[in-house]
Swiss-Prot record:
Enzyme nomenclature, EC number: 3.4.24.-
GO molecular function, one term: zinc ion binding
UniProtKB keywords: ATP-binding, Cell inner membrane, Cell membrane, Hydrolase, Membrane, Metal-binding, Metalloprotease, Nucleotide-binding, Protease, Transmembrane, Transmembrane helix, Zinc
Chain ranges on the Cytoplasmic side, renumbered to this chain: 1-18, 220-728
GO CC aspect terms: plasma membrane
Biased composition (Basic and acidic residues): 709-720
Active site: 514
Pfam family, one: AAA
Record's bilayer topology term: Multi-pass membrane protein
Name of protein: ATP-dependent zinc metalloprotease FtsH 2
Binding site for Zn(2+): 513, 517, 590
């Protein structure tokens, strides 16, 4: 088979888990560091009395500066008036001039105050000049020059540093406020009651932390498969494949020729749309592929896009419906918008039943997200231009659950059945799957196809793979017919349970049980031939099995064939009863299937004494066995139910009588087959027939049966017309 195409949206996600863990650790570490920085107060605490003392010292220093300046100005004026008559004053003036020529403030002692540190022992802070004080109602802040030193080593001081100080005022009264204001005025320090906004300066760490966390969150969403924009929930999740990514063609699709022929017109329209538009024709807007699981519906849709050479949007019906209201409808609209922009193209919706379920069960006046999404799909399919080159291909295996409005002409105009393949179809599918498998000369694909009745394409692909694995496990250079037969048994009956060892009594009982099935199946002419009998445990509960191989495809069953099947089902438990005068629980599945067959004959097929009537309606899915809770709708009264139970019991009892007669007449063959089973544990059809011929004393077929089934006499049309003319 061809390799699966690669999506353009696909990406490597092998290391996403580890990357997300490192991102989370990085985010937590950054948050801890920033939080520690934010909650740590690096402002120096300065008590209110110490602040007043510093302000008072600053006021004294300011007065000394003003006095010195006044003295300097007076000395300069006297020197200009009479510089030679006063020699002593000239000395003072020269010193004053020298003082002024420099920086007078440097010669004034700077007021200082030493206080112990509030955080470290034996450490003292030497506060000096204040600057830029802001006075608030509850606190005073500003800048202060300080040096730190150890108490026992006052000479070893740290370099001068300018930091922000904080003084808590408590609840000041008017006198204290007035006293502080006078000190501020006298100190000459710049101060204000209205500080300008410093939001960024004070809160930049918080803003930085928020920005880092938001950036990390966006990166983590992208790496975890999320999306970057807040509006991305409404974007379609369909995967876009270009024509180069779709190597699948109709040659890769085998066994469903009728379905391929139905969709060839779609490919021709995408290639030559002008031919249809010029004649006024309209291509179907939608193609619905219906069939059991594994029959190749998705593969057929890929082949359509690969043959047409157009873009291919692939998505599932569950990709639309989300927990957020309105998201599904928005995704539907976005999907069709993208498709129209890339027309001609194909939109493939797999599992359409997840989106298009019938609205008949909805609550009147209620709101359902799935119903809203379905309404959007109905509008888009019937709203966009039919000549736009956008074709919707959908697949489902539950068409009975779809809304009727979705199936009407104008939306899904064409319904294509992709059914289980027949013998010829299975042979073609096997030929496709074994292209890259080394086969032995003994392999016959036709023989494999004949023993795989009911298999779909996915089952056959798994069968070929199992056979190849078995050959590799056994060390063979090529896959032989033996591996294919073993693979069929593994798929149908399950894996061998070699560790499930039965005791000798159970093994003998199982051997008689399976021999009874095989003998009755071989004694009745209207049953499928026996392929293999085994007492090797397989699967979950099977301690042994008898495998039959149909000679041809069957679509109808007669009453005699159903009765023969019931006899084969009952033969196992009757063989146990005949040999051991006791029965076991191993016949549970046989009795269950036999009873259901008898009930179907009475209630569904009209094959009983109650008449040819139908007493129940089948509500099961035609493609999914066992789907749904109630599989049947009862259509009879309680009195009729009693009659049905009696008729079912009568039919089963009659089958028991006939089956017991068959086994009693062939007890010698039963013993021989059982003995051989205990020796080799498995016998094939050839060995079974040899044992029957060697140990059979009379005619093998059951008396009263015929080997050839009756056939209707076909009267030629000319003979019929001549008879009618003679009568007239």
């Amino acid at each position: 088979m061809s390799n699966e195409p690669k999506s353009k949206r696909g990406g490597s996600s092998e290391n996403r888990g580890g990357g997300n863990v490192w991102l989370v650790l990085l985010a937590v570490t950054g948050a801890v560091v920033l939080s520690a920085f934010l909650f740590s107060d690096n402002r120096r605490r300065l008590a209110y009395p110490h602040l007043k003392e510093l302000l008072a010292m600053s006021a004294e220093r300011q007065e000394m500066l003003e006095a010195q300046r006044s003295a300097s100005e007076s000395g300069d004026a006297a020197a200009n008036v009479d510089g030679e008559s006063r020699p002593e004053s000239s000395v003072i003036s020269r010193s004053s001039s020298a003082l002024i020529s420099g920086d007078p403030a440097n010669d004034i002692p700077v007021p200082k105050i030493v206080v112990p540190s509030s955080t470290k022992e034996d450490v003292w802070h030497e506060f000096s000049r204040l600057d830029n004080i802001f006075v608030a109602d509850d606190r005073i802040t500003g800048k202060v020059h300080f040096k730190s030193f150890v108490k026992n080593h006052p000479s070893e001081k740290e370099p001068a540093e300018e930091v922000t100080f904080l003084t808590i005022r408590g609840y000041p009264n008017d006198l204290i406020a007035a006293e502080l204001e006078d000190l501020l005025v006298q100190s000459g320090v710049k101060w204000d009651n209205d500080r300008p906004s410093r939001f960024l300066e004070n809160h930049w760490p918080e803003l930085l932390m928020i920005g880092v966390l938001v950036a990390l969150g966006i990166v983590m969403l992208k790496r975890m498969g999320g999306v970057g924009s807040p509006m991305s929930f409404s974007r379609s999740r369909g995967k876009l494949y270009s024509e180069d990514d779709l190597p699948t063609t109709f040659e890769d699709v085998a066994g469903i020729e009728e379905a391929v022929d139905e969709v060839r017109e779609v490919v021709d329209f995408l290639k030559n749309s002008e031919k249809y538009q010029s004649l006024g024709g309209r291509i179907p807007k939608g193609v619905l592929l219906v069939g059991p699981p594994g029959t190749g519906k998705t593969l057929l849709a890929k082949a359509i896009a690969g043959e047409a050479g157009v873009p291919f949007f692939s998505l599932s019906g569950s990709d639309f419906v989300e927990m957020f209201v309105g998201v599904g409808a928005a995704r539907v609209r976005d999907m069709f918008t993208q498709a129209v922009n890339r027309a001609p193209c194909i939109i493939f919706i797999d599992e359409l039943d997840a989106l298009g379920k019938s609205r008949s069960g909805s609550v009147v006046g209620g709101h359902d997200e799935r119903e809203q999404t379905l309404n959007a799909l109905l509008v888009e399919m019937d709203g966009f231009d039919s000549n736009s080159g956008v074709i919707v291909v959908a697949a489902t295996n539950r068409p009975e659950t779809l809304d009727p409005a979705l199936l009407r002409p104008g939306r899904f105009d064409r319904h294509v059945l992709v059914d289980r393949p027949d013998v010829a179809g299975r042979e073609e599918i096997l030929a496709v799957h074994v292209k890259n498998v080394k086969l032995d000369e003994t392999v016959e694909l036709k023989g494999i196809a004949s023993i795989t009745s009911g298999f779909v394409g996915a089952d056959l692909a798994n069968l070929v793979n199992e056979a190849a694995l078995l050959a590799a496990r056994n060390g063979k250079p090529a896959v032989a017919m033996e591996e294919f037969n073993e693979a069929v048994e593994r798929v149908t009956a399950g894996l061998e349970k070699k560790n499930r060892v039965m005791n000798e009594d159970e093994k003998i009982r199982v051997a008689y049980h399976e021999s009874g099935h095989a003998l009755v199946a071989a004694a009745l002419p209207n049953t499928d031939p026996v392929h293999k009998v085994s007492i090797i445990p397989r699967g979950l509960a099977a301690l042994g099995y008898m495998m039959q191989r149909p000679e041809s495809e069957r679509f109808l069953m007669t009453k005699s064939e159903l009765e023969s099947q019931m006899k084969v089902m009952l033969a196992g438990t009757l063989a146990e009863e005949m040999i051991f005068q006791d029965i076991s629980t191993g016949a549970q599945n046989d009795l269950e299937r036999c009873t259901e067959t008898a009930r179907s004959m009475v209630m569904d097929y009209g094959m009983s004494r109650l008449g040819r009537i139908n007493l129940r309606r089948n509500t099961r899915s035609p493609f999914l066995a066992g789907s749904g809770g109630g599989e049947y709708q009862i259509m009879h009264s309680d009195e009729m139910a009693k009659m049905i139970d009696k008729e079912v019991s009568r039919i089963v009892d009659d089958m028991l009588v006939h089956t017991r007669e068959i086994l009693e007449q062939r007890r010698d063959v039963l013993e021989a087959v059982t003995q051989r089973l205990l020796e080799v544990e498995a016998i094939d059809s050839d060995e079974l027939m040899r044992l029957i011929q060697e140990n059979s004393r009379g005619p093998w077929l059951v008396p009263g049966t015929v080997t050839e089934k009756p056939k209707a006499k076909i009267v030629p049309r000319e003979e019929t017309e001549s008879q009618q003319s003679n009568r007239s």
